[in-house]
Amino acid sequence: LFLIMFVSIIIFSFTGWGGFLERLALRVLLIPIVSGITYELIRWLGKSDNILSKVIAYPGLKLQELTTKEPDDAQLEVAIAALMTAEGIKPDEKTIGELLEIGAKNLKEKDIDTYVLDSQLLLGMVLGKDRIYLITNRDKEVSHKDEKEYMALIEKRSKKMPIKYILGETEFMGFDFDVEEGVLIPRGDTEILVEEILSIIDEDKELDVCDLCSGSGAIGISLALNRKNIKVDEIDIFDIPEKVTKSNIVKHALENRVKFIKSDLLEEPIKLGKKYDIIVSNPPYIKACEINNLMDDVKLYEPHTALDGGEDGLIFYRKIVEESKLTLNK
């Protein structure tokens, strides 16, 4: 097509004389010549591999590529939607039950042990409903917009992103806490640490407590929620833990009793001359050589700064012991 246009322009440029009918008749008569020249050019281009032939063929090849290129998924979706709209066809919407089955199947194939629970939590997040609603309304249809959002979340979870990061929250000591990538997700095992400290704090005792390497602030905030007369300093050195901890302090309305201090371990409290009755911490304790052996959910997404405890896993414990001598009340 490009060559025909090219040859036609060149030949017809010499036929500008005479009236309109004369020019029209002459151009019709020249069509066989245009076709013949174009045919010979095509044959020559097919056999030649020099720069001139490539230059002449380039526009035509690009035009061919543009007109014959297969559409991507997004273009296909638009085309199908336009066709269905033109035909007055309304696409079927899947039900809650169908989407739960699809999501669970996808997660199970990726070896996600909690595939049923996770599929329910993710669909509930999209719809703003709890699990009981999903279970009792399995036949209710879900909009295509919500279905697309749900499947995007399923895709994230299938890549082993922790469900807590996707949901943006977790439960610890019976309380809800905001979490996001960049802070360690509080573990159920850590509740033992909180319970042990609560056991040695009287209900009405006024104490100053330090939650060191605070992460999400879950430990210190849980202590403050269970003991109304204590004050807590949440300490971490990184920006995301600072943001998340402050968010959780506000979430639980503890601004008057819980504060955040950005510090490398106890460096700032020492400078400020602060003293604490209790220092609690769940610092990084995994040996550096063992990080790559952790589950994908952990090693691919959770911050290594909250996991890596150095060569023997005890580097932070030694520092905390030494610095605590300068900040603990005797």
Task: For the regions a language model picked out, list residue spans one by one.
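Polar-ligand-bearing catalytic/cofactor-coordination segments
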Residues: L1, I42-P91
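Juxtamembrane "helix exit" motif at the C-terminal ends of alpha-helical transmembrane segments
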Residues: I4-V28, S35, Y39
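A short N-terminal interaction module
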Residues: E93-Y150
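Residue-level signal for inorganic ion chemistry
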Residues: L122, K160, T190, I219, ...
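Conserved AdoMet
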Residues: M125-S199
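Conserved SAM/SAH cofactor-binding pocket of Class I
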Residues: D189-N293
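Mobile active-site "lid"/loop adjacent to the S-adenosyl-L-methionine
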Residues: Y285-I315
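Conserved Class I SAM-dependent methyltransferase catalytic core
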Residues: E311-K330
